[in-house]
């Protein structure tokens, strides 16, 4: 695999579907010739007379076209995804993280962060100013939402079209290097979200070059990328090299794979298995753990099983069932995909087994779904869980957070359930202080017709789900983006500050009781009363008692020292604990 294209071959491009390619670099044209390559990788072009080393703006003229297209492996696109690439090889940065030893996933806490809305400036340098805050909060990994090149000036990042570049609005690759280096100096790992299931609609020049997409084979997000058809060897290498770019050249500690349930690959060796092997190989070479995590709604534990038992060997995968069970328990919402999660028996099952649907019938899907996790092949820490994330907030009609409709007590209960679970917790930025700002779906397509179609499609999508179309914000309106930016001043006021202190106490509790993340599936003891609205579970050294109702409850046999209470009105009297409505307590068992 080619991590960095350097020397005379740095401008090579794969374009098997064209008959002529001309490299345009700093205004000069360099005719390219086809290279002789091994079977499966035919279609590479090279320029025998190429520009000298140094910063060069360049692109490619295909089949006599007078408008150049950028390189698919562009490290920099200073003028956006429709314009010339700029060389960035080798990366001119002196890393200072030689003493960084990395982190394994087990026992850690992840913080999801979108660069553009995390601060008023929306840059990596500005986000870097929050590192000490995250250390104080007790975070281990910062998971950055995609930073790759996309159409327009602001976007979630999941419709990227230039996977090798860092969006210039965030500061470009130099700012990215500074951010990762500073994170490591602060003791924080970095996980980079990537999207390998589709490409965005505009700025995507792959179809002009070769069979990179499976035309007519769309997933729910767009045309599927070509991972198993004719000519797919090179695109698979493109993906593997991209993952190696982040964990190698950019020193990140892990990669988060977006929506792997939308990755279409019918080869005998799935691309995720190849990625798992790549991560292990780089870990072996560097001596640093490289954490690969899959977002998946398949409830298929094969993702985290070892490769020697036909698994993919990833370090972790999401359990959306945990989010849904907690959401229903604290909010009472039971429509749509929340419909199977109404009983506390569901939350109890998820706490013990990781999934609700592990082969059971899903009424939302209209079919049976998932499979059980074999406890001899995976442990609960391999499941990444949350009570909110970018999808679960942003894909609601108004992008509303739990904090915009729930009380302090309900938010506190959700926090306790998440941060004392046997899984790996993930927070979404601002959750820890109950941010009142929404996180809405926003785009900035410069093409009016695409912007209009995006807005209309969003409204129709929520109309079908029963939402009032009048409440759905226009993703193209700049105010939709601006509304989604965090207001950090909230964190020091009222219940926001109170909730933040609770989160800090909970992260400290996890550090003081590492056995919370050292259980096997089925080992968490859980009891509950649906009618009374309480649930209690015992992850080894502590017992967690939760009141999920509007009435006060008294729980007997509550032995042990009180380690944490979300409300001062939760007195422990001998072996009895009184829980006020919507509160929780943690005892040393």
Swiss-Prot record:
SUPFAM superfamilies according to UniProt: (Trans)glycosidases, E set domains
Positions of the catalytic residues: 258 (nucleophile), 295 (proton donor)
Keyword terms: Carbohydrate metabolism, Cytoplasm, Glycosidase, Hydrolase
MF (Gene Ontology): 4-alpha-D-(1->4)-alpha-D-glucanotrehalose trehalohydrolase activity
EC number assigned by the record: 3.2.1.141
Binding positions (substrate): 256-261, 320-324, 390-395
Site (Transition state stabilizer): 391
Gene Ontology cellular-component annotations: cytoplasm
Similarity section: Belongs to the glycosyl hydrolase 13 family.
PANTHER family noted in UniProt: GLYCOGEN DEBRANCHING ENZYME (PTHR43002)
Protein's name in the database: Malto-oligosyltrehalose trehalohydrolase
Organism classification: Bacteria, Bacillati, Actinomycetota, Actinomycetes, Micrococcales
Gene name tied to this protein: treZ
